[in-house]
Amino acid sequence: MLLSLVQRIASMLLLVTISGLLPACNSSGGDAQPQIPLAAVNEQLILTDQQNSALRFDNGAITIRGGVRGIIVVRQNASSYLAFERNCPYQPLDTCSRVKVEPFLRLYDPCCKSQFSFTGQPEAGPATLPLRRYSTALSGNLLTITN
């Protein structure tokens, strides 16, 4: 009987200890942000099309359909392009969470006031995570964007 009581107490202590440790497993320190939903991305741009004319210059950027809330395409140089999800990583589930392009200056979310560099890194505002980046492949004048 005493052994049974000791086993019960030990089981309860183990349960309490495990329960107390679980919140400590949250690496974000309690500031967990919801994740941007996943969406299949497979887009192609013809860089010589007039609608893509901003991509003829370094740091030129355009927005296109695709992804969760759209895709931002940025030209780094003639042979290097970056593509990002327009859904802001700060509060991605807010209906107004959509990053916009201020030509040749910055990327910004008017909803939460976060600002991002043309490499997708947060520069100002509450966002601490970079924009979700998609893969790009250039073949002649055809830019393919995938995830």
Describe every region a protein language model picked out:
Residues 20-24:
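C-terminal motif of bacterial Sec signal peptides marking the signal peptidase cleavage site
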Residues 10-14, 25, 30:
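Eukaryotic intrinsically disordered, low-complexity regions
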Residues 1-13:
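Bacterial N-terminal signal peptides that target proteins for export
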Residues 27-104, 115-117, 132-147:
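N-terminal pre-ligand scaffold of iron-sulfur
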